[in-house]
């Protein structure tokens, strides 16, 4: 009765928490692969201070102490505890882990280096020329670098360097296919274009160019290549005028120029048309070449209407790349 009163002084929740925290001890002598038996240790309740205390189990004993009450007793206070068993697979895994943790660590025997090994071509046997005492020194392996690997993979091939024989446009203009049979021409150059280009570079260009244009049989085709259509031009009454209703005179300095340098100036090709006053269409009389030079003041260029401007290189390519003959 006194024990019940002292137990009644403690709340039921505290007693249930202390009872639930009772430790479970595994009996290692009864572990097997099929089953794992758990035993519940019985707490010793010390009623002197009015609190329940749990005594730890002894080393050799796995059973409850003499003061441990029966599980069926005080069922209303402690509740009923039932034993449980786990499956054989889980218990086997758990027993193996416990054996590894609780079992003493046995020292492994030291490994001996006196085990016989097979001899190979790269590693000599014991007693070979590299053996000094009890330890064998491995042979020195060749040190491989990326440079050696690339040299072995991609071997160098000596190529004979030949001088490039690049023929310029002047070479094709001056030398014909008959003079050099080894050179095969893709496009046969026009003789009239060659004569005209040489005349433009000569000293007496004014008289020579007028004579060449008057004697040429490809004037109309060449003008069409340059974008000059003589049939659609407005006729001019005088040779000095460019158009009938225009009073602009051609500069006298340009008419008197006999030669010019192709490297420092640009060439102009001008068609001069003349015909009867009432006629709508005239015939092409002469064709002259003029310069485009900077004026004395302001650094501006003199521009003349009805004249198409070509650079020397463009004029040369237009002459020889177009089939005007």
From Swiss-Prot:
It comes from Homo sapiens (Human). GO terms for molecular function: clathrin binding. One of its GO terms (biological process) is intracellular transport. One of its GO terms (cellular component) is trans-Golgi network membrane. Residues 1-32, 51-79, 92-133 are annotated as: Disordered. InterPro entries: Aftin-like, Clathrin-bd. Coiled coil: none annotated. This is Uncharacterized protein CLBA1. It comes from the Eukaryota.
